[in-house]
Amino acid sequence: MAIHLEHSVSAKCRPEHIWQKFENLDQWSWWNRVISQSKWQEGQPWQKGSRFLLGLARPMSMEVPVEILECAPPQKVGWVGKFFGVRAEHWFSFEPQPDGTTLMKTWEDFSGPGTLFFGNGRRKAVLKLYADWFEALKFEAERIAREAAARS
C-alpha cells in the first residue's frame, strides 16, 4: 500500500534564505523541535548518495538512516529512508514566487509492508510533523531575510 502525504506554506523570503538554514543539517535540532539529531555519516553533504542519520523526536522517537537522492540548492532536495518495513521517499522544494515570497513544499511517499500500520492517526501525526518543521524553518528563514534587508 502506497501513501502520499504533502504540506506547503508561503514564506516572506527567497529560496536562498531557506537554504541558508536548511543546509546546516548538523544544526537542525537547534531550531526544529521535531528533530532530536541529524548528522552526516558518509559522503559529501548534499551530494547524491551521501548518507545522514535523522533522529526524530516526534511523533515517535526514532532514528532513520537516510540517503540523498537528488539535491539542487537552493530549490530542491530529496532523500530516501527505511524504517520498520517502510520505505519513505521525502522531498522538499523552495519555489520563488512572482511576489518575492517562496512556496515551501514537502511531500513524502511511503511504501512497504509497514504502511499497513499507517492509520489516520499516524497520517495526521506525520502531517503535524511537516507543519511544525516548516513553521520553524519559515521563522528562521524570514529572520535571515529581515537581517539581510537591514544590512543592505
Regions found by a protein language model. Give the residues of each.
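Short beta-edge strand/loop motif at the mouth of beta-sheet-based domains
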Residues: 6, 26-61, 71-76
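A conserved amphipathic terminal alpha-helix motif
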Residues: 103, 109-152
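Hydrophobic ligand-binding cavity/cleft-lining segments
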Residues: 1-42, 136, 152
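Hydrophobic-ligand binding "helix-grip"
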Residues: 30, 55-103, 109-114, 139
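Residue-level detector of beta-strand structural context in well-folded domains
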Residues: 7-9, 50, 66-67, 92
